[in-house]
A protein has these predicted regions:
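N-terminal active-site segment of His-dependent metallophosphoesterases
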Residues: 25-54, 62, 292-296, 305, ...
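Conserved beta-sheet core of the metallophosphoesterase superfamily
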Residues: 195-222, 226, 325, 543-609
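N-terminal, active-site-proximal structural segment of metallo-dependent hydrolase catalytic domains
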Residues: 2, 21-95, 107-108, 261-264, ...
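Extended active-site neighborhood of metal-dependent phosphoesterases/phosphodiesterases
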Residues: 91-96, 113-117, 124-128, 132, ...
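His/acidic metal-ligating clusters that form di-metal
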Residues: 144-151, 162-201, 294-296, 401-409, ...
Length: 628
């Protein structure tokens, strides 16, 4: 009796040790990188070990811990006597919490035998093509997902049928536009004729030098690698980030997986068009975003040429493998029209000693012109408090087109990209704003309102913009006109409970007080023939006794400041305060709000020495006109 107990305990201990070793090996798999897919192929032989004992949970644990996105599964019984009525793929799907796709190749023992796919994502559709197979029916199961298609197969063991199967697979994929992965038990080695044929259209992704079966099972295949994962290379490139074979000696085949980054099609590399910013000091910033990490540059030149190239180096190293791009072109000639385009080459693999690249995207060719010092004419548009109202901006876009309004640059004066939750939301609306402004040709100035300060991505907004001097306030000259832009911060005190002690706008206002003093005393400001002040929250004309820290901090400085006009927003109510009517030393205009019936596009137009201000509603009706 004791001998039996000892024997049973020994078996349990050995089983536990082996299982622990197996799971430890799986748990050592690398974390999947961003923008990659983990593909596994696994001939599970009905989830039975080498002795034919069903091991559903062990197989499921191996798959679950490897955490693949999709698994090509071969040798599956469904409700056969051999499987004791169990639908093997359904059992594995339930235990791994993955979607299942099964096709039957032939009837067997009152059930079915076939191929399957496990996937985290529900397939859009699936289909099967039959392959040559005299010994038993063979086939290829295709499943389409959002970004790729996977084909699961198990080829015949007969070489002639393997070769013929390759041609059938080629025919099945010839019209597919998405990336295609082929995965399965090929029943042949890497050096075989069928493998050579496959490699004419497919890239082998797993390491063919690693055994995928116990060598003893196939003594005629010295490399013992017969399970493969491939990528169809007609329209895509594949970077292998990781690959692994999980050795399980008690099973007929080892699970194999690869982490792959699929190259993006050229038309999906750019996330935004280029947009122009900071047209100051004989330079301009060209910004854009990409969907994938890239190596970027700008091609530009005069007279329609693109004979100059700008790349970015930081401390001697190329600034690349990123998605947000700000290229500063400097030492440009004022008054000269430049052509440019932006270029981004996808980086699919960036390792210490190895780099791989996808395709290169080129934007259309655009133009810009920086003003000369003596430029006296310009037209600028100002929008405020849009609050992500797409319909409103579309109406203004139509108005601009109908009036054939030519302009040089655009201000978005706060509460435009309001309460940004994340980058996707912020960039999504920024794209709309850039489209309205035609920002690839006309520079845009994104100014901060109180709502740009709120929500999780508020601090992230600055990654999208190239602020003058790196601050959300500043000044610049357009020809003989000086623009001064201020940031009023929040509309409540820093101690307000909803800010949780995370704001210090008092300091920001103090910093701007010092900036204002220096700016008003500066040569550029004094020599300008026209001077324009822009900020989001009004300082003048507010409710008496209301919170107005900017007036406290800046009021004395602005009391005698010779601005020709100040343009504000924030209140959602259009207002005009003539000079001196509210303690203001210059005319003040407050733009409207996000509702179509109360929204206005503000137009500043300078011709020679005359500066004209107009406020237009969405129909083009003039709310106010000032000759300044």
């Amino acid at each position: 009796m004791n001998r039996k107990v000892f024997s049973f305990a020994s078996i349990l201990l050995l089983t536990f040790i082996h299982l622990s070793y197996t799971l430890a090996q799986v748990s050592a798999t690398p974390e999947k990188e961003e923008n990659s897919v983990r593909i596994m192929t696994y001939n599970v032989r009905n989830a039975c070990d080498i002795n034919g004992v069903a091991s559903y949970q062990q197989v499921a644990d191996i798959i679950h811990q490897a955490n693949p996105d999709v698994v090509a599964v071969q040798e599956l019984d469904s409700a056969t006597q051999r499987a004791r009525g169990v639908d093997v793929l359904a059992e594995l799907g339930e235990r791994t919490m993955m979607f299942t796709t099964f096709v039957s190749l032939y009837d067997y023992q009152k059930g079915k035998h076939g191929l399957g796919i496990l996937s985290k994502e529900r397939p859009i559709r699936h289909w099967m093509v039959y392959l040559p197979g005299k010994d038993q029916a063979r086939g290829a199961l295709f499943a389409e997902f959002k970004d790729y298609i996977i084909c699961c197969t198990q080829l015949s063991k007969i070489q002639e049928e393997q070769n013929a199967s390759v041609l059938v697979i080629f025919d099945a994929i010839k019209d597919i536009k998405k990336p295609v992965f082929l995965a399965g038990d090929m029943n042949c080695s890497y050096e075989s004729a069928s493998q050579n044929a496959l490699q004419s259209k497919f890239t082998t992704l797993n390491d063919f030098k690693q055994a995928t079966i116990p060598v003893i099972n196939e003594p005629n295949i010295p490399t013992a690698c017969i399970d493969f994962i491939y990528g169809y290379s007609a329209n895509y490139k594949y970077a292998v980030l990781a690959r692994q074979v999980i050795s399980l000696r008690e099973f007929d085949h080892y699970p194999v997986f690869v982490d792959v980054r699929i190259s993006s099609p050229v038309d999906r590399i750019f996330r935004t068009k280029p947009y122009l910013q900071k047209p100051i000091d004989n330079g301009i910033t060209i910004s854009w975003l990409t969907n994938v990490p890239v190596h970027s540059w700008v091609e530009y030149g005069k007279n329609g040429n693109l004979d100059q190239k700008k790349q970015l180096y930081v401390d001697g190293q190329m600034l690349c493998n990123n998605k947000t791009h700000h290229f500063r072109l400097e030492n440009l000639e004022p008054g000269v029209t430049y052509s440019y385009r932006v270029c981004s080459r996808e980086i699919t693999l960036y390792q210490a000693y190895k780099k791989e690249f996808g395709y290169t995207a080129y934007s259309d060719i655009y133009t810009f012109t920086l003003p000369s010092t003596g430029t006296s004419d310009f037209t600028a548009l100002v929008f405020n408090d849009v609050h992500k109202n797409f319909d409103l901006m579309e109406k203004f876009a139509r108005l601009i087109k109908e009036k054939d309004l030519k302009y040089d640059f655009v201000f978005y004066n706060g509460d435009v990209i309001d309460d940004p939750k994340d980058q996707d939301q912020a960039v999504g609306f920024m794209k709309v704003l850039n489209e309205i402004a035609i920002a690839e040709k006309a520079p845009v100035f994104y100014m901060r309102g109180n709502h740009e300060i709120r929500n999780a991505y508020s601090i992230g907004l600055r990654s999208l913009f190239d602020y003058i001097n790196g601050t959300t306030y500043g000044a610049f000259s357009w020809g003989d006109t000086r623009f001064v832009m201020l940031d009023c911060g929040e509309d409540k005190s820093d101690s307000t409970w909803v800010y949780y002690g995370l704001n210090d706008f008092n300091q920001l206002r103090d910093d701007q007080a010092a900036f204002l003093k220096k700016e008003l005393a500066g040569k550029e400001f004094k020599k300008a023939t026209k001077k324009i002040l822009i900020h989001h929250i009004p300082i003048y004309g507010n409710r008496e006794g209301g919170y107005n820290p900017c007036l406290e901090k800046w009021g004395d400085i602005l009391a005698d400041a010779p601005f020709d006009i100040a343009i504000n927003g924030h209140t959602h109510r259009f207002a005009y305060h003539p000079k001196g009517s509210a303690g203001n030393n210059f005319p003040v205009v407050v733009g409207g709000g996000p509702r179509i019936e109360g929204a206005y596009m503000l137009v500043l137009q300078k011709k020679g020495k005359q500066l004209i201000f107009r406020a237009l509603d969405v129909e083009g009706n003039e709310k106010l006109k000032l000759e300044l």
